[in-house]
């Protein structure tokens, strides 16, 4: 049983579209069990990997997916303002690139651009993508701006390949959240 170490903390859990999205479900449970109020955000691509219903059932409020289905005219801004921390897990190359470039093309990236809260980015992608110069430059840009990066692990990837790029395990991400 986890201590209530995150009691009263508002954490926005952003899930982007990679196979590792399934790990966000367990991470959500760990955060809620520790007392956090978890507001989930999913990209349209993430919905190909896990269902909104699953994350909504485990989180503290329904999943946010689009800027256009909320009664609040600026839902991403309100969510970003009340966040104590934003966690992006998994963070795909697209989301990392958009965030580094300041492009807010969906609810997730708009929330990242609108927040002043600390942000923890947990990359997950195939080794070739992770090692690509543009991804590494975007990671370096985010680090320079004070974004916390939890490096991906080395291990078995989708398709059976082995290499760097696997999303950190939910317990490891949770431990990092506790430090922030």
Language-model segments: residues:
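A cross-family phosphate/adenosyl-ligand binding-site feature
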Residues: 1-120, 126-180
């Amino acid at each position: 049983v986890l201590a209530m170490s995150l009691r009263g903390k508002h954490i926005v859990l952003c899930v982007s579209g990679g196979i590792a999205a399934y790990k966000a479900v367990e991470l959500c449970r760990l955060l809620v069990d520790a007392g956090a109020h978890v507001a989930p955000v999913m990209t349209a691509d993430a919905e190909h990997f896990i269902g909104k219903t699953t994350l909504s059932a485990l989180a503290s409020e329904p999943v946010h997916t689009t800027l256009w289905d909320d009664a609040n005219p600026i839902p991403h801004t309100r969510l970003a303002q009340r966040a104590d921390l934003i966690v992006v897990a998994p963070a795909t190359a697209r989301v990392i690139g958009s965030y580094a470039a300041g492009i807010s093309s969906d609810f997730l990236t708009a929330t990242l651009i609108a927040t002043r809260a600390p942000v923890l980015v947990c990359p997950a992608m195939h080794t070739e993508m992770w090692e690509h110069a543009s991804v590494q430059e975007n990671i370096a840009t985010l680090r320079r701006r004070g974004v916390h990066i939890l490096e991906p692990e080395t291990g078995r990837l989708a398709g059976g390949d082995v290499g760097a790029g696997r999303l950190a395990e939910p317990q490891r991400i949770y431990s990092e959240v506790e430090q922030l």
